[in-house]
Swiss-Prot record:
Positions with a binding annotation for 1-deoxy-D-xylulose 5-phosphate: 115, 141-142, 166, 189, 202, 207-208, 211
Protein name (record): 1-deoxy-D-xylulose 5-phosphate reductoisomerase
Co-factor(s): Mg(2+); Mn(2+)
Molecular-function GO term, any one: NADPH binding
Metabolic or biological pathway: Isoprenoid biosynthesis; isopentenyl diphosphate biosynthesis via DXP pathway; isopentenyl diphosphate from 1-deoxy-D-xylulose 5-phosphate: step 1/6
Species this chain originates from: Treponema denticola (strain ATCC 35405 / DSM 14222 / CIP 103919 / JCM 8153 / KCTC 15104)
EC numbers, comma separated: 1.1.1.267
Binding positions (Mn(2+)): 140, 142, 211
Membership in a protein family: Belongs to the DXR family.
Gene of this entry: dxr
Keyword Manganese in annotation: yes
Superkingdom per UniProt: Bacteria
InterPro entries for this protein: DXP_reductoisomerase (IPR003821), DXP_reductoisomerase_C (IPR013644), DXP_reductoisomerase_N (IPR013512), DXPR_C (IPR026877), DXPR_C_sf (IPR036169), NAD(P)-bd_dom_sf (IPR036291)
Amino acid sequence: MGRKRVVVLGAGGSIGKNSLEIIRRFPDRFELAGFSVHSNSGFAKTLLAEFTDAQFVSTKKKNSNLKHEIDEEAVRRLIEKSKADIVINGIAGSAGLKASVEVIKSGLDLALANKETIVEAGELIFQDAEKSGSTIIPVDSEHAAIFQLINAHKKGNIEKIIITASGGPFLNTPREKLSTIKLEDALKHPTWKMGGKISIDSASLANKALEVIEAVKLFSFPPEKIEVTVHPQSIIHSMVQCKNGEIFAQASPPDMKNPILNALSFPKMPESFLKPLDFSQIIKLEFMPPRTDDFPMLALGFEAAGKGGAYPIAFNVANEEAVDAFIKGKIGFTDLADITQEVLNSDWTMKPSSYEEVYDYENRARAIALARILDRVNGLQ
């Protein structure tokens, strides 16, 4: 088999740039068939000068500056023209769902880094993937680890999934200081280099909440059989506990290039270029329970996962809008969970049966979240 032709959606983001590094490092295995950026035309020109045969589109929707909107037709055009074998979806936020839908409809394999796709519309995505023949390979380090562990130990033998969390930059911050956290502090992740939104999600534990919901849907495990443990070193990416009580872990240095390379190489096991862990040296591994009282987003995520219906959609959109408001200085750090809770207080029991219904629920949740944010801006809360 020749080189895999790869399309990178969201090439200017953290996942996109790491994916491009993999393609550069292994020109005998992969070639860049196409890529998208949202609006960074300068970055696109630089890439086109380097990858002269690659197709390119901007996913920015005309006459719209909203981050949650993308040009689906542009994604469809890119997929058709690129003649790709696999697509990496590194688009951040709920906008990535529409891109995933286009990839799945095309029948191409999807290396999925956009967790919102599964959180909001996992059941619909899996149905369409079965019809089109697409394989969905998780790129998130935790879900990539679980994916490998389940393949190795068989789902029927597994009693519990254990997802690790770094604890973020405020792992040891006293509760009374959380309300005074500044944006620049929330962006300083201790172990991972990530984009702004996901860095803040990590700081609030919203990212881990989304990962719990994603794991419930991706691996068909109930939330009561999923546990989160704080592991500051980010060396163990996830674990599974088998029915005999034994626990198996996936361990590797905290570098997103590893799960990206694995996803692009699937179903083969690639030879990595990353330096493996050296157990001849002292390696410190710590585990502790998450501070759910101080960081309530994780508990809200478990609640949304357990209730099902459109609750995961409401959780994701509420958090997305709250994070955007925090970045713009409109609300404080502890408002992130309060706003999300207020949105979840509405009735979201109806399960969406189409993508259109998913988008309707998104719009409804977004309107409530924006109203709650405006209340705070106007000093009403």
